[in-house]
């Protein structure tokens, strides 16, 4: 029997819905942001020191509509004010840790997971490149984008919108050919799959765009439009089909068959751990699963690190490369394909606590919105390494710690408390004394003369073993009661002090 304590619902249900929500967040934010810009021209550039890219005029009624930032309800005006405070802070967020080179690798991984590289036709064949990335708004996501904008020479713009889930979303955008070639391309050299090929295609689109200015070559025009429609790898999802677009431009769709077949190689550079960490920031989870083994009344602690992507062919290459990189770092990693997803997984105490967490600790300043889950697992790691999870008080502390967070659960806390009581009964029944960590002291003729509290050597306790002799305590029962009281005090004080 399994229970997931740090995630809502079943694992498969969560993964699918997280994937759907992320996709919808990106889609809605993209549409709302650029529709707002075109219709209201309400963008204020992030290059203005005092203001940021705001999606609605300040006097718009939407400014008072409330949405969620985490679990807190805020108005759009309040969210914008919070963002401006962070952006214009006297202690800039881009000085909070890690070198610029390290952050660049992190940002490449994040853009691989969450970024969009494409554009729009402004009119006719006048194609305009747009590179965007979105996240649910939080202080941490705002800090990330502010630092990214600084790294990109403050060339980007920001927007804050309310999505259909009632949550605020922050979007970051770079636009225009000059910015694309002078800022985006030099910085994002570590992309893969469709995003890597999109950069190559945009180079070709730009060349065709200039060529078409000099000639009325219909084949070049068809080539340009077909490249635009292939940028994301999801051309079938466009509302206006490729053929319809060509017809609207007075071009014959039959010319598509005459285009030369061109294949684009993928990025051959091996992704770094920081790239994977950035990808994890966009599409990963770090969480804790508790399993209850009914047969022997045992609580099993299972930490997990996951990155999930749709099972589109374009995602296969990078998921395989990231899996290879982690395995090369002696972090045992699996990659599974389902009907809808690829899932990269690092699982178990040894793989997560002993192999992955030490690397994450080196870059904890780059964890942004994942800091809460990381800190929880670091706490659990300390408990496990000390042996505290093999004690009644340690298990109680573990469940209390997990349920102290605001995440919803489908198993009541009381269920786990009852299971811990069952664990205590079984663990105690294994000793002839009927108490765990308490052992009988026998005379030479095998009569009980007392009890000894003796803790396993794996417990990181100060020297605490102690004997309780029956003659000193006026009988076996009183000596055993004193031993139990001593054991519980030592263990509870140890857990309370350290955890």
Each PLM stretch: what is its role?
Residues 1-450, 456-460, 465, 470-473, ...:
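Internal intein/HINT superfamily modules and their associated LAGLIDADG
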């Amino acid at each position: 029997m399994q229970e997931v304590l740090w995630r809502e619902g079943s694992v498969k249900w969560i993964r699918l819905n997280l994937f759907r929500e992320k996709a919808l967040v990106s889609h809605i934010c993209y549409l709302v942001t650029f529709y707002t810009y075109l219709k209201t021209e309400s963008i204020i550039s992030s290059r203005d020191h005092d203001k940021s890219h705001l999606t609605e005029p300040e006097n718009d009624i939407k400014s008072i509509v409330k949405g969620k930032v985490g679990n807190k309800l805020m108005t759009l005006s309040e969210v914008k004010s919070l963002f401006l405070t962070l952006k214009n802070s006297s202690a800039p967020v881009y000085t909070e840790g890690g070198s610029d080179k390290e952050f660049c690798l992190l940002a490449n991984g994040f853009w691989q997971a969450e970024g969009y590289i494409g554009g729009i036709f402004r009119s006719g064949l006048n194609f305009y490149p747009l590179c965007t990335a979105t996240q649910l708004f939080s202080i941490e996501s705002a800090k990330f984008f502010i630092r990214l904008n600084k790294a990109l020479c403050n060339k980007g713009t920001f927007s804050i919108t309310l999505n259909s889930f009632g949550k605020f979303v922050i979007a970051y955008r770079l636009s225009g050919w000059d910015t694309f070639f002078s800022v985006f391309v030099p910085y994002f050299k570590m992309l893969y799959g469709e995003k890597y090929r999109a950069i190559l295609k945009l180079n070709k689109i730009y060349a065709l765009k200039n060529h078409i200015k000099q000639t009325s070559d219909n084949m070049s025009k068809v080539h340009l439009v077909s490249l635009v429609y292939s940028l994301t790898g999801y051309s079938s999802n466009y509302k206006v089909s490729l053929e319809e677009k060509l017809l609207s431009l007075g071009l014959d769709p039959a010319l598509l068959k005459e285009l030369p077949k061109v294949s684009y190689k993928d990025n051959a550079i091996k992704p770094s751990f920081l790239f994977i960490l950035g990808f994890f920031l966009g599409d990963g989870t770090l969480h804790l699963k508790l399993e209850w083994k009914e047969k022997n009344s045992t609580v099993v602690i299972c930490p997990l690190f996951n990155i999930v992507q749709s099972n589109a062919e374009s995602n296969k290459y990078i998921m395989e490369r990231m899996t290879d990189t982690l395995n090369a770092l002696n972090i045992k990693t699996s990659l599974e394909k389902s009907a809808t997803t690829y899932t990269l997984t690092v699982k178990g105490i040894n793989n997560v606590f002993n192999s992955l967490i030490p690397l994450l600790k080196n870059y904890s300043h780059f964890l942004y919105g994942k800091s809460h889950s990381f800190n929880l697992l670091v706490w659990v790691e300390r408990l496990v390494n000390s042996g505290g999870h093999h004690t009644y008080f340690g298990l109680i502390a573990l469940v209390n710690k997990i349920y102290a967070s605001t995440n919803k659960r489908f198993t009541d806390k009381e269920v786990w408390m009852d299971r811990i009581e069952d664990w205590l009964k079984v663990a105690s029944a294994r000793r002839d004394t009927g108490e765990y960590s308490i052992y009988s002291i026998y005379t030479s003729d095998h009569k009980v003369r007392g009890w000894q509290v003796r803790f396993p050597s794996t417990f990181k306790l100060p020297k605490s073993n102690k004997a309780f002799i029956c003659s000193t305590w006026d009988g076996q029962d009183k000596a055993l009661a004193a031993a139990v009281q001593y054991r519980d005090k030592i263990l509870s004080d140890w857990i309370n002090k350290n955890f």
